[in-house]
Amino acid sequence: MKKIFLIFALFLYKPLLAEDLEITKWFNQESQQFLEIMNDTSVDKSDFNKYEKFVEQNFALKSIAYGLINEKVIEGNDQETLLKYQKAFKKYLIKTIDNLANTSVSGDIILKDIDLKDKVYIINSNIKDGKSSISLYWKVVKINNDYKIIDVIVENTSYFVTKKSEFTKILRKNRGNLKKLIEILEKF
C-alpha cells in the first residue's frame, strides 16, 4: 500500500517539478537577456529594436494595456482606437525600459524563489551589484505555452498599480477620453 501511495505521489509531483524547472529556466534566460540589454553601451539609445523585441517576447501587452483602463472605457471605444491605444502603450513601455537602461542597471539578478498563486507565478529576485541589493518581484502567467510578465514590482512598488492609478487619473480628468490618454502616451 505504501508503494502505491509513493508511486501515486511521485506521479502527481513530477509535472509540478517539470513546471518549476521550466519557469526557472525561462526566468534565468530572460533576466540575463534583460541585464545584457540594460548594460549594452554599444546600443544606440534611440534604436528601440532590442527593447521592442524583449517587450514583445516577454510581456502580456494586451492584458496589461487593457488592465490599466476601466472596462467602460474599453467598451466605449472602437477597435481602431483600442489598437492605437495598445500600440501607444507598447511604445510607452519600451521607452520606460529605455529610461531604466539609462540609469545603468548592473550586477546580477538572483532568483530567490517562485510561488504559484491562482495561475500567476510570483518570482522573487534581487538585483545585486556588490554594494547594494534591490528587491524585484515578477508576476508571470503562462499564455499559449509562453511565459509572459504581467507586472514588475520593484522595492514594493508595482508598475501595474502605479500606471493604473496614473491612467485612471488622466482618464477621469478627460472624462474617459481614451484618445487623450493615447496622445499623452505618445508624447512620452
Question: Which positions does each model-derived feature cover?
Answer:
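Short beta-strand edge/turn micro-motifs at domain boundaries
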Residues: 133-161
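Early exported N-terminus immediately downstream of N-terminal targeting peptides
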Residues: 21-100
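Boundary at the C-terminal end of the N-terminal hydrophobic targeting segment
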Residues: 16-20
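Surface-exposed, charged secondary-structure patches
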Residues: 95-134, 184, 188
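Sec-dependent N-terminal signal peptides
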Residues: 4-13
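Low-complexity, intrinsically disordered terminal/linker segments enriched in charged
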Residues: 154-188
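Surface-exposed, polar/charged faces of alpha-helical domains
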Residues: 36, 43-46, 80, 106, ...
